[in-house]
Every structure is written in structure tokens, then in C-alpha cells.
């Protein structure tokens, strides 16, 4: 007899109801729970999947290169990056009528195409690519690389090539490999690429496979490097009049510290970026060699964690940093590790979103407004999912892997012991921010509605303005630090030698970029609304994790696992308190918050890009301003994507906007109705099916049963999330592209 799905659980495979399918989908990634799983096998399987993951990434990048080379307009775009719109790929759609074909035949193409809003054109141009042939070459290289990684994944599942458990648990060796080998060496390689290929190309000198070994990146060669005269590499940088990709105004420097932006491309200086990557490489290669591996030198992390000394002095009592037992706790729990990794990656992804627009690194991308908006929004959305996932796996760690004996007296136990103080403080700050921020918005809304806008309560963000002034913004007249030429920040080494400072001060005070935007009362309010969202999301997640093992209401909660709906009517009030439920609730708040973040960023930038900052400044201080002047006003073009007179090239976004709303609203059907309703409905449908001629020829083996409460919540949450993302993505791209192309 054929074995039934799922193979990883005999219990589920023998379930006679449709529960078999749903539970199998839910448990597919929970490798720990699979039949016959050992710790060693678990590590080996996860290790092998990393190669598959990398193969998918390389395949994806290869497909971008291939489609742009085949169907894009890269060679036309680089001749005029500010006015030619980059093509992602052609569209083949047999349903298109003549008006649609005309609407989507754009950007100089001879058939319907999609426009690229990902920034890949700017990236490839900046790093030295100039022809379709180079794109094809890169595509084939990445395809071969993907194949190699797929093979490596398969190989590491073969008995002879499976690493042992001890190999996986050698933390110092892994740090050595990741810090020095991956981060350090790849940064060094990237610095090498920028110096040997990208910088010469930016100065009009082609470097390819044919001549890169014979073309020296600097006239002085390696002599300054070996004689310690490194300053030579910073002399004669590109001038302010440099025309990108030509020799006009070009210098010879390869490692500089100019600060600010290239005047023509409005992106960071390539020579500054090469310097940055070289510095990162040195730091990480050193960092990777600090820990004790096979040679008996360097730090042992376990010894450091367990030592009760701080810089050689013994520390005891409440103010020490008790990490005893943490090494083994971390090293033996994949959920603990994953929680940390997701948290770090989440922070850095949000950080990338902030830096990609304020300090653009790719040539001319600062003037491709739709791409800027898409990249910011994309990275902030990714960040919230990673952060919520971090807390989810932290909670699973506390339920499944935390050992109270092993962690006696260390920081983990301390956090659990004073969880009431942590949770109540988060609750207090959420209430404070919520009532005060909403109070100000509602007050302002009411007085504006009654025709007395002068009665609004408008608060200048003086502390934030002070921080901007300290970094050199002179607009506010707060002469302090870098905005005061006489201050020590201005005159201290190395600034007196005019290193980096002039470029930075020009950039921060220019008004045409997104560096340290001018802020006022509208920013003050929305900042606190975002703070409310962040703190409430954190409250839900932290409470869920810290109460995951047990609470006063349910002391034995850990015995019920990570996700349970309720413990029946016998213990009233145990519904909604599993750690999974806190993950579920927090995601609504996380989406709410990222909505406010992206609304704020987008509306503020629309004003800057259109040269009309007054609209945001005057109308962001009350609720109707946000609804009317941001959401409603900017969806006007969108809902006109197609009308009785035909279609335009926004029609696909108009359709997606409607479809996103539909998916989002469908979520509530699962979120607001409970299991009994669906069970009755299914039984009625089965009854009807079995009595309908022809239809009743189709039978099924599994008895149809409704989703469990937790599963229905997952389905509802998935629809809510996907609909939310689709709706805002369509709104963002259409409202920006409709104005700026």
C-alpha cells in the first residue's frame, strides 16, 4: 500500500480526516517533531537546506540578469539614466486587447513590458556593467554557481559527507569561518571588485576579462602599499565636475574619505565605498581570529561566559553580568540561535531601509523616486516579519529548550524572575504613548474641523532638531557641535585637515536629498504614533515569550507546548494565552506600525520630490489630513487605472489594489467566525455533494472536518497580511509612478 502524506509522521498519516493534510502542512518545518528524528540528523538536514537556499538566491539573481539582458533596455538606459525608464521584462498576455498593448508598450520598447522598480539597473551600472553581454555572462556564472550549491546540498546528505554533531557545535570554528571567511573575505573581494573594475569604469576606462590582469587600478601600483605610504591612494580624487562613466573630471584616487555625494549621480563616492569595504574586511578578518580553535590560542567563549570577572576584576552580586551556563544554552538550542539571528537580521534590514534612501550608494537611484519608495517599503516590511519571528522562536526556546537548572542565577533567569516589571513597564509606555498621541491627533482634528486650525496643539521636536544640528544641520540656528564652526567637533583631528567634513556638511544642508530631513510638529506626532506601535508590538511579543513557560493563571503552560487554543472549559480563561497567540496578535500590530512608518516616509518624500513640503507640514498634524491628503488624494490615479474610456499603464496596479482589498477582507471571515460554524457548513456541503448527480461520482477518502481554532487563525492572518501588503504595494507604486514615471 502506498504510504500516505505525510511521511514524517505515522500518527498523522493514519488520521482518517482532512486534519491529516492541514496538520502535515503546519508540522512540515517542525523537524524536531518528526518521527525518528535525532539531534545529529536535525543539524545535518538544516545544514543541507542552507545550500538549497543559497542556490535559490543565485538562481533568482541569475534570472534578473538574464531577463534584463534578453528583454530589457540596459544599454539604452545607461546612456540616459535620468529619463529612460528601466524595463524589467516583457509581458506576454493573450488577454490583452489593443488599448492594453498600447498602454504597456512603454520605455522605448516595441511590445508590452514591465518597468523595473527594484534598482538593479542602478546597481549593475554602479558596479561597472555596461553591456548586455556582461549581464548574460553574469547570469550564466550565477546559474553554474546555483548548480554547484545544489550539488553541495545533495552531497552533504550522503552518509560519507554528513558532518558530525561535534562539528556543528564547534562555535569558535564557526565564528572563524563566518567572520573571517565569509564576511571578511567577501568584503575584501568586493573592495577588490570596486577598485579594479567599478572605479575604472566610472572613469570611462573599460575593464573586462580581456584586460583586468594588465590594467593597474592606480598609477603608482603597489609601491605605496608596500612602503606604508598609503595616503597616495587617497590623493587626486574625482572632482565635483566629474561626469560618471567618463574621464571628464576624473581623478586617480582609489581609497578616499570625501564624505557626502557625487554631485552628478547624487550617490556616495565609489572611492569612499571601496575604502569602507576594505576597512570592514580588515576588521572582520581580525575578529575571526580572536577565538580559540585548533591552535590553543585566543578566547574560549565558554570560559568568557562562565567567568565572573570584568576586565580581570572579580564581580559578584546584583550588578555583575552573570552569563554562566549561557554558552551551553545557546549552543544546544537551535531556537535560541534562530531567535538571535532573526533579531539581528531584522534590525539590520530596517537599518538598510533607512540608509538606502538617506545615503544612496547606487548612481542616479536617488532620482528614481518609485524605486526609492519601493525599496524602503520592501525592507521595512521584511524587517517586521523577521523581528516578529525572532520573538516567536525565542518563545519556542523557552517552552522546549530552556533548562532552569543550567541557567541558575544568569541573565536569562533574571529576566524571567522580573518579568512582571518588564511587562508592566511596556504596558505603561504603550498606554502613555497611545492616549497622548491619539489625544493630540483627535484634538487637532476637531479644531480643524470646526474651522479654527490655529487652536491646534503643535509641538516642535526640539530634541531631534538638536541632534540634527549636532550633526551639522544649520537650518534651526542651534549652533552646536558640527553646526558651529568654532566647536571642538568641527576643529578636532582629523577635521582640521578637511577630511570628509566639507562633503558631509554640503550634503546635510543641501535640501535636495533625504539626509536629515527638516522636521516639525507633524513629524513629532507621527514619530510618537510609530513609537506607540513599536512598543505595543513589543509588549505583546515579550509578554508572550516571558509567560510561555507559565503564568499565575496557568503555571503548567509549558506542558501544553508552544501553540494550544484553550485547555477546555474546566480551566476558564486559558484561551488566547499560548505563546503562539502572542505571535498571532503581535503581527497585526506589527503590520499596523509598518503601515504608519511607510505612510509617513512616502508622504513626506512626495512633498520633497514635488517641491511642495508645505502639504505634509500643514496637514500631517490632524487625522483628516492623513486620510484626505495622503490616502485619498494619492489613490485617485490608482482607481482610474481603467475606466469606461479604456486603460492606462496603471491598470495592473488598480486591479491589484482591488484584489488586495478582497484578500484582506477575506481574512476577517476566518478571524471572526469560529470552528463550529465551519464544521456545520462543511457537513451541509458534504450532504449536498453526496446527493448531487455527477458531482457525487467524485469521492474522497478523508472525512472533511473544519480547521482547528489555531489553524483558522493562521489562515485569517495569512489573508490579512497578504491582502495588506498587496494593497499598499499597489498604492505606493502607482501613486509614485503616476506622478514621476
From Swiss-Prot:
Signal peptide: none
Topological category with respect to the lipid bilayer: Multi-pass membrane protein
Keywords linked to the UniProt accession: 4Fe-4S, Chlorophyll, Chromophore, Electron transport, Iron, Iron-sulfur, Magnesium, Membrane, Metal-binding, Oxidoreductase, Photosynthesis, Photosystem I, Thylakoid, Transmembrane, Transmembrane helix, Transport
Residues that bind [4Fe-4S] cluster: 566, 575
Binding residues for phylloquinone: 678
Chain sites annotated for binding chlorophyll a B1: 661
Cofactor note: PSI electron transfer chain: 5 chlorophyll a, 1 chlorophyll a', 2 phylloquinones and 3 4Fe-4S clusters. PSI core antenna: 90 chlorophyll a, 22 carotenoids, 3 phospholipids and 1 galactolipid. P700 is a chlorophyll a/chlorophyll a' dimer, A0 is one or more chlorophyll a, A1 is one or both phylloquinones and FX is a shared 4Fe-4S iron-sulfur center.
EC number(s) recorded for this UniProt protein: 1.97.1.12
GO cellular component entries: photosystem I; plasma membrane-derived thylakoid membrane
PROSITE patterns: PHOTOSYSTEM_I_PSAAB (PS00419)
Chief subcellular location: membrane
Location within or outside the cell: Cellular thylakoid membrane
Biological process annotations from GO: photosynthesis
GO terms of molecular function: 4 iron, 4 sulfur cluster binding; chlorophyll binding; electron transfer activity; magnesium ion binding; oxidoreductase activity
Protein residues bound to chlorophyll a B3: 669, 677
Keyword Cytoplasm: no
Keyword ATP-binding in annotation: no
Catalytic activity: reduced [plastocyanin] + hnu + oxidized [2Fe-2S]-[ferredoxin] = oxidized [plastocyanin] + reduced [2Fe-2S]-[ferredoxin]
Similarity section: Belongs to the PsaA/PsaB family.
Quaternary context: The PsaA/B heterodimer binds the P700 chlorophyll special pair and subsequent electron acceptors. PSI consists of a core antenna complex that captures photons, and an electron transfer chain that converts photonic excitation into a charge separation. The cyanobacterial PSI reaction center is composed of one copy each of PsaA,B,C,D,E,F,I,J,K,L,M and X, and forms trimeric complexes.
Protein name (database record): Photosystem I P700 chlorophyll a apoprotein A2 1
Species lineage: Bacteria, Bacillati, Cyanobacteriota, Cyanophyceae, Nostocales
Protein encoded by which gene: psaB1
